[in-house]
C-alpha cells in the first residue's frame, strides 16, 4: 500500500468514496489488514479487475455500484455525479477520456453480474470485452469539468507515483 501525503492510495480513494456513498466495499485479491470496511475477495483468483467487479457487485445492497481503481486517488464527486445522471436504462455508464473508455471509474448495474460471471468462465476476462456485451452509456469528456477530468490521473507507473509524491496530492 503505497503512501501519498499522509495516507495510502487506497485510503485516499476510500475517503473520497465515503464522502459520496453510504456503503463502500473494497474488492481485494487477499484480505488487507488495517482496512476497516467490508472486503470481498476476487471471485476467481488471477482474473484481474473483472473478478473484483463480480465480487463487489455480488455484495452490494443497491441496484447500482460505482467502481473505481485504487490507483486513482483524485476521483471527484463531480465525476461520480455526472456519470450517475446518465444511468437511465443502461447496464453500465463508462466515461471516455482521450478516446479511451475508463471502465475502472464507472457505474455498473447488478444486472451485469451474469454476463461478468460468464466472461470469467470463458477465455476473455477483460472488462472491455464484457462492455461489448452490455448496454453501455459512454460519457464523453467534453461534458466534464477540470475536477472531473483530474479524476482520471492514475498512478500506474513508478514515475506517476514519484510525481504525485513530489507534488503532493492536490498539486498534481
Regions found by a protein language model. Name each.
Residues 153:
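Dinucleotide-binding Rossmann-like beta1-alpha1 core, especially the glycine-rich loop
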Residues 1-127, 132-150, 162-171:
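Nucleotide and nucleotide-moiety/phosphate-recognizing core
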Residues 159:
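Conserved active-site and cofactor/substrate-binding residues in soluble primary-metabolism enzymes
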